[in-house]
Amino acid sequence: MRSHGQQISDRLTVEVDCHSLGPSDCPSMTSSFSPLDSPTPTPTSLYSQSSMASPVWHEHSHYHHGLPMERRTSATPLRSAFRMTDLTAGDGMMNMPCGHMDRQEQMPLPDYLPGYDDNVEQLWIPQEMPKTYQEPQFPYQASMPQYNQMARNYYHRPQQAGYLPESASNPCLSRPIFTQPMERMPNSASMTNMLHWMPSHESLVPQTITPAQVQPYPSGPVTPPSSAYSDFPTNIPTFKSHTPSTPHRSVSMGTPSGSDTPVSRISGHNDYQEEFQLSPVYREGMMQRHRQPSRKPSKKQLLRSNLSLENLPSIIKQVQFKCKEPGCKGRFKRQEHLKRHMKSHSKEKPHVCWVPGCHRAFSRSDNLNAHYTKTHSKRGGRNRYVATLDETSQDFDPDFRGQLTPDGRPIYGSKLEDSMPDCGELSVDGWDD
């Protein structure tokens, strides 16, 4: 016999064959019974003393106490699974000898409980459930606290725990309120009852539901199903993001883990979408998203149309500096640029090349520096090579002023005036630009 800690965590299914008992032989089994109409709010009490006190067994059935149990090893999740300790609860319940049963022995209930079928939803019991028996054989279970009985009315719903199926604890899933408001919900607590109206995860789009589009509940007091669910108009976001705590049944309605999930196989979601009409605000937002922006002229087109001087603003025309030399069309934005340009028209060339034998003079210093780089820093040219102006030479020294050897290397200690001719012999007219 395995430890009772492992037995309470196992899910056993009981096959009951009662050919010797009928509704007349068992007085406690004469009223109709449905797991969804159970007056107790906890999952464990669905088969405890208050809910099992009035089940209806099939008339042509017999019960055998010593019936051997069948071990099911199918890969599918256990259906109609509950704990064996729940069957032994209650005073009027038939006491079944459960001490010799193994924890994996399973017997199906769908043939003997009305309202259940092969697709019945799994009723999982939380693992934190306190263990109420003491003996390892658990011949009986401590009596559960009696809950107040409620009238078995369709509109009086007991508060059920979050471990029950969504179809049993959520009124949004239990009946289609839009198309069939007065139809009684089937007794089966399976997922197939809501396949014909539940939308898939791809069709859950944000929509505004107006009061005129939703048919109200029938008149009469309605017990709130759970604290996790409020009134139905604000119920859709909660239903979409709700994920059951049990890992065996956790199917996130918002983020399915695979392409072939129960949610992806749900059909009939088009009927659900047709019940909701897009609100004007939502429709306007969708139309604005698809509208193309109006074509505006680009900045380049505006600049090209205003490139001519006639179209320039007056403030830009005032800063135009034109060259006053006849025949020159030079225009400058700054006055210093115009002054530098005017030197090219004058005879003043104060910047003279210092290389011996070169008599080039320039009106601007930048022109002289360009002359040094392009003319005297290269070997094999028609002008004299100067090693002090060559950046690749080991004698590079742009500040050197003195005598040079025939191959262009500097003669340190010499003065530039020694080899320079008299300045009076040179005329400014002989200098090249």
Curated annotation (Swiss-Prot):
GO BP terms, alphabetized? conidium formation; sporulation resulting in formation of a cellular spore
| Chief subcellular location | nucleus
Protein's cellular compartments: Nucleus
Q: Where are the zinc fingers (C2H2-type)?
A: 321-345, 351-376
| InterPro entries xref list | Znf_C2H2_sf, Znf_C2H2_type
Q: Does the keyword Nucleus apply?
A: yes
This entry carries the following GO cellular component terms, namely:
chromatin; nucleus; transcription regulator complex
Q: Which domain of life is it from?
A: Eukaryota
SUPFAM superfamilies tied to this protein: beta-beta-alpha zinc fingers
Gene knockout outcome: Completely destroys asexual development, resulting in masses of vegetative hyphae that branched into the air and formation of white cotton-like colonies.
Question: In what ranges is there compositional bias, type Polar residues?
Answer: 240-264
- Write the record's keywords in alphabetical order, separated by commas: Activator, Conidiation, DNA-binding, Metal-binding, Nucleus, Repeat, Sporulation, Transcription, Transcription regulation, Zinc, Zinc-finger
Keyword presence, Transcription: yes
Q: Name one GO molecular function term.
A: DNA-binding transcription factor activity, RNA polymerase II-specific
Where along the chain is composition biased (Low complexity)? 30-49
Annotated segments matching region Disordered: 24-49, 240-269, 286-306, 391-423
Biased composition annotated in UniProt, kind: Basic residues? 288-302
Q: Which residues form a coiled coil?
A: none
Q: What does the record say about induction?
A: Expression is positively regulated by SNF1.
Report the protein's function: BrlA, abaA and wetA are pivotal regulators of conidiophore development and conidium maturation. They act individually and together to regulate their own expression and that of numerous other sporulation-specific genes. Binds promoters of target genes at brlA response elements (BREs) containing the conserved sequence 5'-(C/A)(A/G)AGGG(G/A)-3'. Regulates genes involved in conidiogenesis.
Question: What's the protein here called?
Answer: C2H2 type master regulator of conidiophore development brlA
Source organism of the structure: Penicillium digitatum (strain PHI26 / CECT 20796)
Its organism's taxonomic lineage begins at: Eukaryota, Fungi, Dikarya, Ascomycota, Pezizomycotina
Q: Which gene encodes it?
A: brlA
